[in-house]
């Protein structure tokens, strides 16, 4: 059924959960936490070729204005407290995308003494984007997977 047929009737019915989740998926504002070479691919995804703005994804410079954090690159032990602090400053509900092999599990530097073996040891991760570095298409797919996850969540407690 097309939307034109629904609007001719004069009303649309839905649940509050679906409406709230629809608005959340259409206006995701990520906080960029670029730590290494994966950040270049993240910038590439935000540029004109892939244009994340068409999905409602607008990069924000402040954690208080964002609801998604994209951790892109190698997370060192010295940077881990800053990552947690920025995550704690984000408003609820908040989601995390781990981008790249280094953010997912330490990557090439897994056995280094100064590298955290996955950002999921510091913050809860919702979507993992594999690759070294992952392509802009992979990040775009990860964002769409996060949108699907948000659509499936129950917003209002039952």
Swiss-Prot record:
Keywords: 4Fe-4S, Cell inner membrane, Cell membrane, Iron, Iron-sulfur, Membrane, Metal-binding, NAD, Quinone, Translocase, Transport, Ubiquinone. It catalyses: a quinone + NADH + 5 H(+)(in) = a quinol + NAD(+) + 4 H(+)(out). It is found in: Cell inner membrane. Its main location: membrane. InterPro entries: NADH_UbQ_OxRdtase-like_20kDa, NADH_UQ_OxRdtase_20Kd_su. Gene3D superfamilies: 3.40.50.12280. Binds 1 [4Fe-4S] cluster. It is an enzyme of class 7 (translocase). The keyword NAD applies. It comes from the Bacteria. GO terms for cellular component: plasma membrane; respiratory chain complex I. [4Fe-4S] cluster binds at residues 37-38, 102, 132. Its cofactor is [4Fe-4S] cluster. Its EC number is 7.1.1.-. PANTHER family: NADH DEHYDROGENASE (PTHR11995), NADH DEHYDROGENASE [UBIQUINONE] IRON-SULFUR PROTEIN 7, MITOCHONDRIAL (PTHR11995:SF14). Belongs to the complex I 20 kDa subunit family. NDH-1 shuttles electrons from NADH, via FMN and iron-sulfur (Fe-S) centers, to quinones in the respiratory chain. Couples the redox reaction to proton translocation (for every two electrons transferred, four hydrogen ions are translocated across the cytoplasmic membrane), and thus conserves the redox energy in a proton gradient. This is NADH-quinone oxidoreductase subunit B. It comes from Janthinobacterium sp. (strain Marseille) (Minibacterium massiliensis). The gene is nuoB.
């Amino acid at each position: 059924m097309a939307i034109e047929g629904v609007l001719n009737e004069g009303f649309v019915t839905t649940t509050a959960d679906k409406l709230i989740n629809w608005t959340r998926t259409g206006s995701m504002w990520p906080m960029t936490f670029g730590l290494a070479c994966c950040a270049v691919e993240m910038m590439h995804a935000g540029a004109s070729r892939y244009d994340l703005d068409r999905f409602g994804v607008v990069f924000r410079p402040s954690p208080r204005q964002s609801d998604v954090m994209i951790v892109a690159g190698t997370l060192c032990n010295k940077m881990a407290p800053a990552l947690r602090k920025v995550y704690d400053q984000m408003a609820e509900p908040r989601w995390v995308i781990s981008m790249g092999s280094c953010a997912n599990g330490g990557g090439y530097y897994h056995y280094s003494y100064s590298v955290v073996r996955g950002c999921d040891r510091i913050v809860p991760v919702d979507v993992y984007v594999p690759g070294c570095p992952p392509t802009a298409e992979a990040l775009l797919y990860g964002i769409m997977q996060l949108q699907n996850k948000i659509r499936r969540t129950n917003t209002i407690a039952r």
